[in-house]
Amino acid sequence: MKLLYGSQNFGYDIDNSDKDWIEIVYPSWQDILNNKLINKEIKNEDGSVTKVKDIRCLIKMIEKCNFNDLQVLYSQEMHDCEDLKWFIEHREEIVKHNLRQLYFTNRGYVVSCLMSGNSKDMIRAYCFMQLIERAFSGEVMTLCDKSLRELRNQKDNQLSANEILERVDRLKELAVASPVHDGIVIKARKEIERLLKLHMM
């Protein structure tokens, strides 16, 4: 299961952006017995990166509610991903199951991007601000926004760091009051168990 991973999934890529990948793999019996999770990064000859993750890592990725992880459910390019069908079909519930966690996790990423001060991270911060707002808006969740490519060339129209953080912080009270719907996490865990059994047969 190989999926495009990175700026293309959010829409702030440029023409010469590397195409990075995430490959989701099944563990061996030995890995399961030793409770070993496959999690590594490979540098490809063309300069791109492939992250290799055990399918069991999906649960932690879902629970963390980080858009950097959840982007796999919205990847713009997927290869041999039939086993991820259930997760993609339920991605709306998965993304929004714990809006409090989603808010604080991704707010932290926004802050770290703003602190770096470089233009690329400012675009990331703006993108994640929009994603946080979208998650709380009641709209169907989407990740990719091609207008972010244009924003790179319109520096005068970009929000300041303070404006980005102010917009994110407006949602704090709503985030704190949001209930957790962890039923979808239980279902996701059962789906992974089902896939593991099928794969190991």
Protein language model features and the residues they cover:
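A structural signal for short, well-ordered beta-strand segments and their strand-loop junctions
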Residues: 4, 71-72, 134-138
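A basic- and aromatic-enriched beta-loop-alpha substructure that forms the phosphate/nucleotide-
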Residues: 32-113
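Active-site nucleotide-donor binding segment shared across nucleotidyl transfer reactions
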Residues: 1-35
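Conserved nucleotidyltransferase catalytic core and NTase-mimicking acidic/glycine-rich helix/loop elements
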Residues: 80-201
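Generic structural hydrophobic/aromatic packing signal, biased to beta-strands
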Residues: 2-4, 21, 58, 125, ...
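Conserved aromatic-histidine-acidic binding/catalytic patches
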Residues: 14, 46, 116-120
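Residue-level marker of positions within ordered structural domains that often coincide
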Residues: 26, 63, 130
